[in-house]
Amino acid sequence: MSRRNAAEKRPVLPDPQFNSRLATMIVARLMKHGKKSTAQRILSDAFQLISQRSNGADPLEVFETAVRNATPLVEVRARRVGGATYQVPMEVRQERGTAMALRWLVNFSRTRNGRSMAQKLAGELIDAANEAGNTVRKREETHKMAEANKAFAHYRY
């Protein structure tokens, strides 16, 4: 184990455009090679597309619903016990769950078919808000794995 002190947790400031901390977090995950303004443009374009496609619904609410639907509650973690590796189900802290949901949303958006990243992100967010799409499937898969390995729950650490 490390002898150093744990790194100080920096507060996430709300996004200046949408006044949302989740927006700041997804911009950080969308960003490639430090190009933050490009990531912010992708997000704002995606939000415009969401409001067009969902008959003027608030895109920030759609986004927050999508993140809520994609956030896992349990996950499995590998634990080595006497030469055997067990997949131990563990509860996910809210912070980590949100981070996982955002990471999945961005990654599955990138693998989608579409013209621009904004269109792909908008599509994935709308699907996740409607409890469909790859991101929600990934969360369900994670929950199923945890359920299947419930027998090893007593190995929790």
From Swiss-Prot:
<dbReference type="GO" id="GO:0003735">
    <property type="term" value="F:structural constituent of ribosome"/>
</dbReference>
<dbReference type="Pfam" id="PF00177">
    <property type="entry name" value="Ribosomal_S7"/>
</dbReference>
<dbReference type="InterPro" id="IPR023798">
    <property type="entry name" value="Ribosomal_uS7_dom"/>
</dbReference>
<protein>
    <recommendedName>
        <fullName>Small ribosomal subunit protein uS7c</fullName>
    </recommendedName>
</protein>
<keyword id="KW-0994">Organellar chromatophore</keyword>
<dbReference type="GO" id="GO:0015935">
    <property type="term" value="C:small ribosomal subunit"/>
</dbReference>
<comment type="subunit">
    <text>Part of the 30S ribosomal subunit.</text>
</comment>
<dbReference type="InterPro" id="IPR020606">
    <property type="entry name" value="Ribosomal_uS7_CS"/>
</dbReference>
<comment type="function">
    <text>One of the primary rRNA binding proteins, it binds directly to 16S rRNA where it nucleates assembly of the head domain of the 30S subunit.</text>
</comment>
<dbReference type="GO" id="GO:0009536">
    <property type="term" value="C:plastid"/>
</dbReference>
<keyword id="KW-0934">Plastid</keyword>
<comment type="similarity">
    <text>Belongs to the universal ribosomal protein uS7 family.</text>
</comment>
<dbReference type="InterPro" id="IPR005717">
    <property type="entry name" value="Ribosomal_uS7_bac/org-type"/>
</dbReference>
<keyword id="KW-0699">rRNA-binding</keyword>
<keyword id="KW-0687">Ribonucleoprotein</keyword>
<dbReference type="InterPro" id="IPR036823">
    <property type="entry name" value="Ribosomal_uS7_dom_sf"/>
</dbReference>
<dbReference type="GO" id="GO:0070111">
    <property type="term" value="C:organellar chromatophore"/>
</dbReference>
<keyword id="KW-0689">Ribosomal protein</keyword>
<dbReference type="GO" id="GO:0019843">
    <property type="term" value="F:rRNA binding"/>
</dbReference>
<dbReference type="GO" id="GO:0006412">
    <property type="term" value="P:translation"/>
</dbReference>
<dbReference type="InterPro" id="IPR000235">
    <property type="entry name" value="Ribosomal_uS7"/>
</dbReference>
<keyword id="KW-0694">RNA-binding</keyword>
